[in-house]
């Protein structure tokens, strides 16, 4: 690396930029080898960047229809960059005196995503869980990867007409993952910091919490149960809070395979966040009237309805 620094030409940078595999099957993509790289080259590291994909659609591979509802999509065992492993690398990085680590490229399924999976409601739930898992692990940030060509995992697609340089662009689709991105931004707004959460359940439910600079607590509940047997409610115990407002992330029929563009039910399917939707939008603006149900606590307990295949952000102002 020092020999590269000594060349002295090209774009001036604080340190050389390298991109290495995050897959455990690669000779350089093992946890031990990556730790050795960090330790050996710490003085040259400006940013430690890894990639993550939950699944694989490359070379004809396919994932199960409900893949993004599974824990395997959150923590892919062959990716050293997975949330439940990256803490080991971050510890080595911090010991070496470096703190800037990022998931510089990630999405649901590698090689443009998978039709019927990456472009359905389950991708919104996956993104929320994945992003909050990385926040808990301590990474500085994440970059959701997208491409200009047609793909299934891109938040948006666009159409264009005309010729260079006078193209006219139009909105093609807003995919379900974008709802997850918006919900994630709500959780992290206003300099929010993570709070510890203790969850007791046998269901496929995840919980994350933050508190922002205005003293608002937000609890994210994600129910990845796939059938009505997973319907129910969550009792949240927290003292010192006011009435809670609910931002519900819902889809028609609680169907993980639905989107704003499917017709799995009569009249078509719709995703809503806080009662609003992008379905029918021609310019990217959200449609409909916002609806935020209120939950009044009983003592220190809040009862939050949580149907299967859904998520909700519970906002509670602290007194």
Regions found by a protein language model. Give the residues of each.
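Noncatalytic carbohydrate-binding groove/subsite architecture in carbohydrate-active enzymes
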Residues: 1-130, 137
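Residue-level detector of short, conserved catalytic/binding motifs and their immediate flanks
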Residues: 46, 132, 140, 217, ...
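Structured core elements
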Residues: 49, 103, 143, 218-221
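Glycine-rich beta-alpha junction loops
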Residues: 52-54, 107-108, 148-149, 223-226, ...
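Aromatic/acidic polysaccharide-binding cleft in carbohydrate-active enzymes
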Residues: 103, 107-207, 213-214
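Carbohydrate-binding surface patches
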Residues: 201-242, 246-256, 309-312
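Acidic, Ser/Thr/Pro-rich beta/coil linker or hinge segments at domain junctions
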Residues: 241-302, 306
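Extended hydrophobic packing segments that form well-structured cores
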Residues: 300-318
């Amino acid at each position: 690396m020092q020999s590269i620094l000594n060349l002295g030409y090209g774009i001036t940078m604080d340190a050389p930029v390298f991109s290495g595999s995050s897959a455990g099957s690669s000779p350089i993509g093992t946890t031990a080898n990556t730790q050795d790289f960090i330790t050996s080259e710490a003085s040259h590291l400006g940013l430690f960047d890894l990639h993550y994909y939950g699944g694989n659609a490359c070379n004809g591979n396919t994932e199960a229809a409900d893949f993004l509802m599974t824990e395997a999509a959150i923590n892919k065992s062959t990716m050293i960059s997975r949330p439940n492993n990256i803490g080991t690398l971050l510890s080595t990085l911090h010991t070496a005196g470096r703190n800037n680590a990022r998931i510089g490229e990630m999405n649901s399924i590698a090689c443009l995503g998978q039709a019927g999976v990456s472009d359905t409601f389950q991708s919104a739930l996956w993104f929320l869980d994945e992003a909050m898992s990385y926040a808990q692990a301590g990474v500085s940030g994440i970059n959701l990867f997208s491409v200009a060509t047609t793909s299934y995992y891109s938040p948006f697609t666009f159409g264009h007409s005309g010729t260079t340089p006078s193209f006219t662009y139009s909105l093609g689709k807003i995919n379900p993952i974008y709802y997850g991105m918006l919900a994630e931004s709500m959780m992290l707004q206003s300099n929010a910091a993570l709070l510890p959460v203790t969850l007791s359940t046998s269901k496929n439910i995840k919980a994350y919490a933050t508190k922002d600079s205005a003293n608002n607590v937000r609890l994210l509940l994600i129910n990845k149960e796939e059938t009505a047997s997973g319907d129910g409610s969550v009792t949240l115990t927290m003292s010192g809070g006011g009435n809670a407002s609910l931002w519900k992330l819902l889809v028609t029929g609680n169907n993980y395979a639905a989107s704003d563009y499917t017709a799995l039910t009569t009249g078509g399917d719709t995703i809503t966040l806080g009662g609003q939707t992008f379905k029918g939008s021609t310019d990217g603006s959200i449609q409909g009237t916002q609806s935020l149900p209120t939950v009044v606590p009983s003592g220190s307990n809040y009862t939050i309805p949580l149907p299967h295949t859904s998520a909700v952000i519970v906002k509670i102002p602290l007194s």
